[in-house]
Swiss-Prot record:
Source organism per UniProt: Arabidopsis thaliana
Segments of this protein annotated with the region Leucine-zipper: 125-160
InterPro entries xrefs: HD (IPR001356), HDZip_class_I_plant (IPR045224), Homeobox_CS (IPR017970), Homeodomain-like_sf (IPR009057), HTH_motif (IPR000047), Leu_zip_homeo (IPR003106)
PROSITE patterns: HOMEOBOX_1, HOMEOBOX_2
Biased amino acid composition, Polar residues: 158-171
UniProt xrefs under Pfam families: HALZ, Homeodomain
GO MF, one annotated term: protein homodimerization activity
GO CC terms: nucleus
Annotated protein name in UniProt: Homeobox-leucine zipper protein HAT5
Effect noted on mutating residue 119 to K: Abolishes DNA-binding
Length: 272
């Protein structure tokens, strides 16, 4: 036999079966082979990672029990669902009562309630998420509409502000200058002076109003009355100069023989 051959000796007893490799050195002997086979069966019976369905149908997590995994019947699941809707928390006394009523072990009932609560929380989170998502979408839509309304109102405010500023600028413009009463037109003043000179040069007997602003009219009084001969009086020269006027030599006093009843003589002024 070749040294590297592998064979199994069936002649050995059940408890002392041996494997030989090559030159007949024992590799695994006795109870070691049985332990390896038990480990393989255990791994096949219960995988390391269990799905939610396996947890839902599994009875409990005690690996020391040799029986196979048992699935719950439809009636048992229905009764457990009704009990869960009544109260999702499982008390020890209630767990024992349900186990006796359903023909299950208390550990099976506890595991089922634990898995059912996990799924219920997941469903509740999904419902809450959907509700919050719909609320968020609605708020986002309302926000967009509010932003559009805000932009529209802002544009209207800007337009109204520009119109108001235009009206204020128009109102603040200075009005047209109106001439004051004291500020007369020089042309009007010259025309008035020429009109006055024309009246004086026409030879009429009308009187003219003379003031300090027209001294040339006072100095030329004699030119307007050339036919009147000045009358000499006994007044002083200084008084004559101070009291001189345009009509000083025109009126000459005359003595009338008539007397009033008091005997006083009245003086009459004659026009030459």
């Amino acid at each position: 036999m070749e040294s590297n051959s592998f064979f199994f000796d069936p002649s050995a007893s059940h408890g002392n079966s041996m494997f030989f490799l090559g030159n007949l050195n024992p590799v695994v002997q006795g109870g070691g082979a049985r332990s390896m086979m038990n480990m393989e069966e255990t791994s096949k019976r219960r995988p390391f990672f269990s799905s939610p369905e396996d947890l839902y149908d599994d009875d409990f997590y005690d690996d020391q029990l040799p029986e196979k995994k048992r699935r719950l019947t439809t009636e048992q699941v229905h009764l457990l669902e009704k009990s869960f809707e009544t109260e999702n928390k499982l008390e020890p006394e209630r767990k024992t009562q349900l186990a006796k009523k359903l023909g299950l072990q208390p550990r099976q009932v506890a595991v089922w309630f634990q898995n059912r609560r996990a799924r219920w929380k997941t469903k509740q989170l999904e419902r809450d998420y959907d509700l919050l998502k719909s609320t968020y979408d609605q708020l986002l839509s309302n926000y967009d509409s509010i932003v559009m309304d805000n932009d529209k109102l802002r544009s209207e405010v800007t337009s109204l502000t520009e119109k108001l500023q235009g009206k204020q600028e128009t109102a603040n413009e200075p009005p047209g200058q109106v001439p004051e009463p004291n500020q007369l037109d020089p042309v009007y003043i010259n025309a008035a002076a020429i009109k006055t000179e024309d009246r004086l040069s026409s030879g009429s007997v009308g009187s003219a109003v003379l003031d300090d602003d027209a001294p040339q009219l006072l100095d030329s009084c004699d030119s307007y009355f050339p036919s009147i001969v000045p009358i000499q009086d006994n007044s002083n020269a200084s008084d004559h100069d101070n009291d001189r006027s345009c009509f000083a030599d025109v009126f000459v006093p005359t003595t009338s023989p008539s007397h009033d009843h008091h005997g006083e003589s009245l003086a009459f002024w004659g026009w030459p």
